[in-house]
Amino acid sequence: MQFLAFSVIAGFLAAIIVVPPAVSAGMVANASMSWFQDLPEDIAEGPFSRPSTIYAADGTTEIATFFDENRDPVKLDQISQHMKDAIVSVEDRDFYKHGAVSAIGIGRAFLNNIVNSNSGRRQGASTLTQQYVNNLIVDAAVSRGEDATATLNGNKTYAAKIREMKLAISMEQNKSKDEILEGYLNIVNLGGSNYGVEAAAQYYWGISAKDLNVAQSALLAGLVQ
């Protein structure tokens, strides 16, 4: 059912993207399906960049630490429940209820954006899984020396969104919700050069992610970029 709902949405959008309006319905269907089937289904996860430390001759005394992205990946059970609850509540409150793509969310965002088209108040429909996929795409682009902002802007096109949806569905067929949440909490930007909740918790409060309280978790969830 999840894949069927997605296919209907993807087929409609793909037809808009790849087929001129003057061709027949059969040609639209064939071109859309071919284009959709050619989209990738897998995306690499890590290893993520981590800080590099220079030590003194004794091998233990730290002299300096260098990083473009301050990151310290941890397991899900090393992150406080408050933090897990906060990020799900802010980013995707129905994360554990819907599939990789939320048809309800897409419909809600579509209607909202039509109603508020003149005000500029746009609403997104990406699930937490889709956001994780998007972060992985950006991380891979940066590792290739590409610009993160340019990649993010490119990910907002219809074609990029369909690709994101397909990757998200494939991911949920191979990973549990908890595994996806763990990955997301280790890659998401939480202000400045801090990526992932462990690095952010250490940077802002000098504590581990497992010790984050309700207020701290809510603040970090509000910093998600």
Where are the model-predicted features located?
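Peptidoglycan glycan-strand catalytic modules in the bacterial/periplasmic cell-wall system
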Residues: 48-225
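N-terminal type II signal-anchor transmembrane helix
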Residues: 1-54, 62, 94
